[in-house]
Amino acid sequence: MSTAVVQADDLMEPSLQSIVSQDTLRWIFVGGKGGVGKTTTSCSLAIQLAKARKSVLLISTDPAHNLSDAFGQKFGKEARLVDGYTNLSAMEIDPNGSIQDLLASGEGQGDDPMAGLGVGNMMQDLAFSIPGVDEAMSFAEVLKQVKSLSYEVIVFDTAPTGHTLRFLQFPTVLEKALAKLSQLSSQFGPMLNSILGSRGGLPGGQNIDELLQKMESLRETISEVNTQFKNPDMTTFVCVCIAEFLSLYETERMIQELTSYNIDTHAIVVNQLLFPKQGSECEQCNARRKMQKKYLEQIEELYEDFNVVRMPLLVEEVRGKEKLEKFSDMLIHPYVPPQ
């Protein structure tokens, strides 16, 4: 067999068609450095998935919440249909929701004569002094909610790189918090529960045992989902970058971390590429294209077994259904620059 044929066979398709076609996928994460077009890519991928699947949910865990801006409609904590679609919904969640919000099932502590003692708050503070517990419980609560909804596939528009992979550590964080709370409960629980009475002094009138049960159920949810995250048939991670040194460096760091957690990643979307016409006299365009070409070659070399999608720098912002659909087509049908 000739070398040319081998290379043609080995060449990975420069599109996300394989992800859209893989009907076993349940979780798709889209991540990368800030400002590289993550939200545009995740919205566009969700649009393509909506053509192939019965129901798609797009979730933003980025505190900046750009989904509303991208689609030009307001989204919140509850999933709602995207205008113009019957099977694509979106929601924006705050990954740093407070423990009070998570555990409180009702208000009215002001009527409780024991609430002023602060013993419940002290227990809560001790239990949640472990870094990341707040975020872990919030994420687990979201997963619990999402699991109860019957969406075929869920696309996460994640926070910038530094925060993207925190969810992988959440089961461990929750286990630590549970161990700490169990220890406190076995030592002081019966005494505190009897002192505080049936109100328990914790948010929503829960006692310490109920708090433990709540955390245990969240830990089980997040552990179960994390097992799915490590299954390449069910989960994949799409990296988004631009052809610049820092973005490429972040992408490499992220891919190494994903690999260490056994999370599948085999697609990179390279945004904002310049394609100056032959003979163009725009010096800046040509200089930038030369730089981008260098980093593109590095990406092709480093990730030869990845689907590398090349997306052009557009003259207008990608906002609104029409422009997102146009952009989403280029994720599937590779962009051909005009000659």
UniProtKB/Swiss-Prot annotation:
Q: Where does Zn(2+) bind?
A: 282, 285
Q: Where's it found, cell-wise?
A: Cytoplasm; Endoplasmic reticulum
Q: Which GO terms describe its biological process?
A: cellular response to oxidative stress; pheromone-dependent signal transduction involved in conjugation with cellular fusion; post-translational protein targeting to endoplasmic reticulum membrane; response to heat; response to metal ion; retrograde vesicle-mediated transport, Golgi to endoplasmic reticulum; tail-anchored membrane protein insertion into ER membrane
Q: List the disulfide bonds.
A: none
**Keywords per UniProt:** ATP-binding, Cytoplasm, Endoplasmic reticulum, Hydrolase, Metal-binding, Nucleotide-binding, Transport, Zinc
Q: Does the keyword Transport apply?
A: yes
What top-tier enzyme class does this entry carry? hydrolase
Q: Which residues form the active site?
A: 62
- EC number of the protein: 3.6.-.-
- Give the matching InterPro entries: Anion-transp_ATPase-like_dom (IPR025723), ATPase_ArsA/GET3 (IPR016300), ATPase_ArsA/GET3_euk (IPR027542), P-loop_NTPase (IPR027417)
Annotated Gene Ontology cellular components are: GET complex
Predominant cellular place of this UniProt entry's protein: cytoplasm
Matches recorded under Pfam families: ArsA_ATPase (PF02374)
Tree of life domain: Eukaryota
The UniProt record gives the binding positions of ATP as 33-40, 244, 271
Keyword hit for Hydrolase: yes
Stored SUPFAM superfamilies: P-loop containing nucleoside triphosphate hydrolases
List the Gene Ontology MF annotations in alphabetical order.
Answer: ATP binding; ATP hydrolysis activity; guanyl-nucleotide exchange factor activity; identical protein binding; metal ion binding; protein folding chaperone; unfolded protein binding
Task: Note the NCBIfam families from the entry.
Answer: GET3_arsA_TRC40
Biological role stated in the UniProt entry: ATPase required for the post-translational delivery of tail-anchored (TA) proteins to the endoplasmic reticulum. Recognizes and selectively binds the transmembrane domain of TA proteins in the cytosol. This complex then targets to the endoplasmic reticulum by membrane-bound receptors, where the tail-anchored protein is released for insertion. This process is regulated by ATP binding and hydrolysis. ATP binding drives the homodimer towards the closed dimer state, facilitating recognition of newly synthesized TA membrane proteins. ATP hydrolysis is required for insertion.
UniProt subunit comment: Homodimer.
Which family does this protein fall into? Belongs to the arsA ATPase family.
What is this protein's name? ATPase get3
Name of the encoding gene: get3
